[in-house]
Amino acid sequence: MELLQKILYANRLAKWDIKPFDAWLFVCFVLLGSFLLSSLFVSAYSFISGAEQDFESLPFVLASGFGLQLSSILAWYLFKQLAIYEVRDQPVGCLAAAKVGAIGFACVYLTLIPTMLIWRLFLDTIGIEYEFQLPVLLVQNGGSPVEMALMICLIVIVAPICEELVYRGFLFRYLNHRLPRGLSILVPSLIFALMHLNLYSFMPLLVLSIALCIVYRASGNLVSSITVHALFNLVNVLMIYLIEPIEL
C-alpha cells in the first residue's frame, strides 16, 4: 500500500521548458509523418507484391500500421534535433521503471475489469451495438506465420513504444506543471481514448491512459508506461485468441 501511494503522488518530471513553436512543430511532424509514412508503406507493399490496395486485408493493415506508428519515432527524432531545452527530470533506472510499470499494470487491470463490464452494460442499455474492430477480426481469422508474428510485434512492442512517445513522452510531459495535476492527466487521456475511434473501448482506454500518466509521472521514465501499455496489449491479444473467430 505504501508503494502504491508513492506511485500515485510521486512526480519525477520537472517542468518541460520548450517553446510553444517547438511543441506545435512536433505535432506537425506527427500528423504529417503518419500520413506520409503510412501511405509510403502501403504503396511500397502494393508495388512489391503486385496486389491492389485493400485496407481490409492483413498485409495492408500491417503496412499501414507500421507506417503510422513508426512516424512517431521519426517525429521524435526530428524534434530532438531541432528543439533546444534543458532536461531537469529525475528519472529512475529502466529496471526500477519496469517494476513500477508491472505494479501499475496489476493495479489498473483490476480497475479495468469492472470498468469494461459497466461501460459495456451502459452502452447496451442505451441501444449501442458492439462492433468488432477490424484488427481484432484480422487477428482472430489469422494469416501466415510471418504476418501473425508481425501483427503481434506491432501490437505488443511497436505500438506501446510509439504511442507512449507521443501521448506521455510529449503531450503529458508538456502539460505537466502547466495545468493542474488532474487536467494535465485528463487532457492527454481523453485524446488518447478518442483517437482509437471506438466507443466501446473509450472508457477502458481513458482509465488505462490515466494510469499510464501516473506511472510515468512517478518514475520519470517512459519505460514504466511502455511496460503497462505492452502488458495491456499482450493480455488483449491473448484474449482475442480465446474468442471464437468471426468471419469477415
Predicted feature residues:
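N-terminal, membrane-interfacial amphipathic/helix-forming hydrophobic leader that caps
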Residues: 1-106, 234-248
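Juxtamembrane helix-loop-helix connectors linking adjacent transmembrane helices
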Residues: 45-58, 84-159, 177, 246-248
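Hydrophobic core segments of transmembrane alpha-helices in multi-pass, intramembrane catalytic enzymes
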Residues: 67-72, 151-155, 205-212
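Transmembrane alpha-helical segments in integral membrane proteins
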Residues: 71-80, 153-176
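Membrane-embedded alpha-helical segments of multi-pass transporters/permeases
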Residues: 73, 77, 113, 117, ...
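Membrane-interface helix/loop boundary segments of multi-pass membrane proteins
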Residues: 162-187, 217-221
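Functionally important transmembrane alpha-helices
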Residues: 182-248
